[in-house]
């Protein structure tokens, strides 16, 4: 009889654990889709020079490191966009985008091809990109991103 009780308790515990993992995986999958949608919105805003949307997407303490290794704040990026110093003609993403969710933080890595200029300097080329997104009351916002040029080997 004791053995049946132990087996029953063990089975219930395993089922409960499996359900918790399933709920967490579903939450991560939903968050990943939200991040991917926000990335599309972000890229469209960059291409259309939509400062109002970028103002919402970038956190107040946002930092961008461009392919030349220069860092820029949210205010600097917006000023470059409004002045025309930053102007992108196209952004295409390779199929290798990876979105990793860690609670209210998402880390996104990918390979991108950009045509245009950043901060008044030609920036056309291929890059490895890393973006760090945080989810707060305003939804998913970009807190930091960096582009690293891909060079031929």
Where are these regions (language model features)?
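Short, low-complexity N-terminal intrinsically disordered segments enriched in polar/charged residues
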Residues: 4, 8, 19-60, 141, ...
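Hydrophobic core residues within well-ordered beta-strands of beta-rich domains
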Residues: 106, 112, 127-129
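Short beta-strand edge/turn micro-motifs at domain boundaries
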Residues: 126-151
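Sequence/structural signature of outer-membrane beta-barrel proteins
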Residues: 115-117, 150-152
């Amino acid at each position: 009889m004791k053995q049946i009780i132990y087996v029953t308790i063990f089975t219930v515990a395993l089922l409960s654990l499996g359900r918790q993992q399933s709920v967490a995986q579903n939450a991560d999958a939903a968050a990943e889709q939200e991040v991917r949608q926000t990335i599309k919105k972000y890229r469209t805003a960059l291409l259309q020079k939509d400062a109002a949307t970028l103002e919402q997407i970038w956190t107040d303490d946002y930092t961008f490191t461009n392919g030349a290794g220069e860092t820029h704040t949210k205010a600097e990026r917006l000023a470059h966009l409004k002045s025309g110093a930053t102007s992108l003609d196209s952004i295409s993403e390779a199929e290798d985008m990876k979105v990793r969710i860690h609670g209210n933080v998402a880390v996104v890595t990918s390979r991108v091809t950009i045509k245009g200029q950043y901060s008044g300097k030609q920036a056309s080329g291929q890059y490895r990109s890393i973006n760090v997104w945080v989810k707060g009351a305003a939804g998913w916002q970009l807190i930091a991103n960096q582009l690293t040029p891909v060079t031929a080997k």
